[in-house]
Structure formats: structure tokens, C-alpha cells
């Protein structure tokens, strides 16, 4: 059975003790790395080598006590666990480049889930990497990544936005267990796109309609409980100080990256290889009955 919530909870608060960095000090390529306090020396070196951390990177440590302090509002103490082991890094990218997320040994949170929640929090133009020395769920990485971005860019993110972004990640992960990770991430992104493009709904009833419409468009079936969970999340988003213009911009950049990849020689070759693979399987099946 998949371990949900355990392990990557460290990364949620990994950067809470990062020394203040001024905007004048931040530059393209600057890196902040977070390490769990309970990593063994060998595991610590393993993740540092994996992330290819430069000598001038800011590195901080987080304790399990800090994990409980910042995550206890959303999940139980048992789910948070007793060890801080996860790691992450955020690298400042050039203006207008958008967000890029990559993960390793993360079983419960997809790249798209992190991308969605980071957009909500106002994080932009950064390369994000989340990892652990062994497989963990990854739920806790967001808070640390937000803090890393905040201190390196000198852009304060309001507490209500941080809270709703963390709630979004938890909600998407839980929903992903029921309807599939891709469906959950796509559904959240579609509803947010409606908020960003057409304006924040005036009331709860309008939010319910947007949830229903998005689920219908994506051919996703939701239970009443799942629908209520989403309505609750987006009702909080409605009241949070979210920069929806920036969310829209980051969503557009993410779409542009996908489109450019598909249209590139690399993307076309990849798609052709996928097609060839399934054709070969089909031909093998057909040959059995000849």
C-alpha cells in the first residue's frame, strides 16, 4: 500500500529558517536547497549530488518539529510522521521563462500538482526539483518551496495564499487517489483557468457550477463528497489574495512549453516512437490469430 504523506513532509517547511536574501542579491541561477534534519550523512550527500548543488547555494535544515508546526492544520500527526528526510531545491530562472517542476522518488504528488499549487502561491519563473533518498509521498514539499522562492526573490507571499496553496496540494493528492492523478491535476487547473480568464465567481453557487462544468468537460465523475471538497477549496481561493493575472500567465506559459515540445523535432520523434510502440503491440496481437 502506498505510503501517503510520509517522508516529504520535511520539504513543506524545509526553508523556514533560510536567512533573508534581498532582491538585489537574487539572480538568475541562484539556488536554495532544503535538507531534512534526519537524513543520514550518506543520504544527505546522495541528494546533494543528485541535485548537483553548486558551492554557493544556500542550504538549510528543517526538523520534524517544524514539519508538525506548519502541516498539523491539514493532516494528522501520524501522517506527518517522526522524521524529516525530504529535500528540494528552487533555482531562479530568467523573467518570463515560467515554471518547471521535476521530481524523483515522489509517489503521491505529480509534477503537475506541484505546478498548480506553486502557481496559486504566486511562484513564477523558477526551476523546481523535489526529491528524497527513497520513495515518499511528497505532500510536504510545497511550503518549503514557497519559502525558498519568497526569500530568494524578496517577494512576500501572504499567509492566506500559502495556506490555500498547501490545501490545494493536499486536496489534489487525495482526489488523485480516487479519480487518477492526471484527472485531478487537470480538473484543478481547468477550474483555476476559469477563475483567471473569466473572473472569480461571486458566490458558492457559481463555484459549484464551475466545478460541475469543468468535471463534465473533462469527462470526470465526482462524488458529492469530492465535489464539496473542491467547492470548499475554491471558495477559500475566492477569498484569498491570489494574483489571478499571474496564474493565467503561468498557465499560458505551461501550455506554450507543451505545444513547443510537440511541434519540435524531439517531440515529433517522441510521439512517433509511442505510435510505433503501440502499432508493434497491435501487430503482435494480430499475428497470434493468423
Curated annotation (Swiss-Prot):
Disulfide bonds: none annotated. It comes from the Bacteria. Induction: Transcribed under partial control of SigM ECF sigma factor. GO terms for cellular component: membrane raft; plasma membrane. It is found in: Cell membrane; Membrane raft. Its main location: membrane. This is Uncharacterized protein YpuA.
